[in-house]
């Protein structure tokens, strides 16, 4: 007789409580995806460079039109809170100090991908679409020859 093991999925609230309790170290790079706490890939120099270039372009947009977010959490559902590379958000007077943005507040979301293309394309982008984010760019960094 075999027993099927059940995974314990976490909510965003539980995830935040774990963080506040110090379960994650200051340098831990994790995000909550579909109830699972996943370690994020290390940021390569090419990835960081691409994000910086995007910031340089988007920084020119006046803040009364959009707030620029970089690797900040977006609460998609009760069990999913990814940290996309770049987002443009609807302006808010408090700059989202009281709560992380939700899908209806996202104007544009960009994921830069080099080592996690399959996961970003097959898991993250569909999650963004299901949550109602209207504009998502998956920026795939090609390997140079």
Language model region names:
Residues 1-145:
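Gly/Pro/Ser/Thr-rich low-complexity, intrinsically disordered segments predominantly at protein N-termini
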């Amino acid at each position: 007789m075999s027993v099927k093991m059940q995974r314990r999925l976490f909510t965003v609230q539980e995830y935040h409580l774990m963080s506040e309790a110090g379960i994650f170290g200051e340098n831990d790079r994790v995000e909550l995806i579909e109830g699972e706490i996943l370690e994020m890939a290390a940021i390569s120099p090419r990835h960081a460079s691409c994000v910086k270039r995007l910031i340089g372009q988007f920084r020119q947009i006046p803040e009364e039109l959009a707030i620029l977010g970089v690797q900040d959490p977006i609460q998609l559902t009760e069990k999913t809170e990814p940290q996309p590379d770049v987002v443009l958000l609807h302006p808010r007077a408090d700059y989202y100090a009281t709560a992380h943005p939700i899908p209806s507040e996202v104007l544009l979301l960009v994921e830069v991908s080099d080592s996690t293309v399959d996961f970003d394309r097959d898991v993250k982008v569909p999650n963004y679409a299901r949550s109602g984010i209207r504009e998502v760019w998956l920026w795939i960094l090609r390997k140079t020859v």
